[in-house]
């Protein structure tokens, strides 16, 4: 028995050494001025736009200081979960409380009636793709919908409760399939290309994600209180790094139900949702 315990003790450091560590360092945090922030995006003007769920609004931050600049459409976007910027300055907003994705010609129209939109029961995610099409995640029915202007182009089912829809550098689309604890990749024509659900990721509730210039996925696993960096180009995907220790908290390397992700070069912005703030992590480049 002593020999067995000794051998296990020898093995433990090797396991810990093989575990992926943090892929970025804590840099800055905003004041807790939000109300359950969800996904966020860098706008065409370089500012940071946050879907502030319980505020039913879009919060605008300076990405350099994480100071709040202004609130847009205050109280007009019930249960808002996502915001996406597309070609020519268009904006799509997943207005979850209205079960619709609203599309505006630009940010100045957020307080007015949308230019167009699509009905999407309990929509959690919206993507204005570089091809000009709108992809909406109708979580209530589990359908990923593709629309061009007002024309319905198709849908795929099987994603009940899914959240984000994000575009990779190669134009493919990634879905954070929350209830199924997986990530699913599609072509622009909604042909399924890949599924990432290997136990090594430890997914509990992947909500929102962004994709780096290298095609790596940065995933907020809300229920695990972690952020994962994943390389999807290898079989079954490779876990490159993790932020957070799996328990809720406040401070560097800690999150409480993180949801939103936005990547900008070597900077990573996250919605630290139950702490009602935005945090920034960075990779120092020599």
Features from the language model and the residues they span:
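A short beta-strand motif characteristic of beta-propeller blades
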Residues: 23-31, 67-73, 110-117, 151-157, ...
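Beta-rich, blade/repeat-based domains predominating
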Residues: 31-44, 75-87, 118-133, 158-170, ...
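Conserved beta-propeller blade signature
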Residues: 47-49, 90-93, 133-136, 173-175, ...
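Short loop/turn segments immediately following the C-termini of beta-strands
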Residues: 53, 96-97, 139-140, 178, ...
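WD40 beta-propeller blade core
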Residues: 59, 102, 143-145, 184, ...
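Short loop/turn segments that connect beta-strands within beta-propeller blades
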Residues: 62-66, 104-109, 147-151, 187-191, ...
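Loop/turn-rich, solvent-exposed surfaces of beta-rich toroidal or solenoidal domains
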Residues: 204-230
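Blade-level signature of beta-propeller repeat domains, shared across WD40, Kelch, NHL, RCC1
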Residues: 256-286
């Amino acid at each position: 028995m002593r020999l067995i315990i000794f051998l296990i003790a020898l093995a433990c450091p090797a396991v810990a050494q093989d575990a992926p560590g943090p892929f970025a360092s804590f840099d800055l945090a905003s004041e807790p001025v939000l109300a359950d922030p969800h996904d966020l995006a860098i706008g065409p003007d370089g500012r940071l736009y946050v879907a502030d769920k319980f505020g039913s609004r879009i919060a605008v931050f300076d990405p350099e200081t994480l100071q709040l600049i202004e609130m847009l459409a205050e109280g007009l976007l019930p249960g808002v979960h996502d915001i996406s910027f597309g070609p020519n300055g268009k904006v799509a907003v997943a207005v979850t409380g209205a079960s619709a994705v609203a599309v505006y010609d630009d940010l100045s129209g957020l307080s007015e009636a949308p230019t167009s939109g699509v009905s999407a029961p309990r929509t959690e995610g919206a993507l204005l793709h570089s091809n000009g099409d709108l992809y909406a995640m109708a979580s209530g029915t589990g359908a990923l919908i593709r629309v061009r202007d007002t024309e319905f182009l198709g849908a795929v089912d099987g994603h009940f409760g899914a959240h984000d829809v994000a575009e990779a550098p190669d134009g493919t689309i990634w879905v954070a399939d929350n209830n199924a604890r997986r990530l699913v990749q599609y072509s622009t024509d909604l042909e399924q290309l890949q599924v990432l659900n290997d136990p090594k990721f430890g997914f509990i509730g992947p909500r929102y994600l962004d994709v780096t210039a290298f095609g790596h996925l940065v995933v907020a696993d809300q229920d695990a209180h972690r952020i994962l960096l994943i390389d999807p180009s290898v079989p079954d995907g490779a876990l490159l790094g993790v932020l957070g220790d799996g328990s809720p908290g406040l401070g560097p390397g800690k999150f409480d139900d993180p949801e939103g992700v936005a990547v900008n070069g070597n900077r990573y912005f996250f919605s630290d949702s139950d702490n009602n703030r935005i945090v920034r992590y960075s990779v120092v480049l020599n």
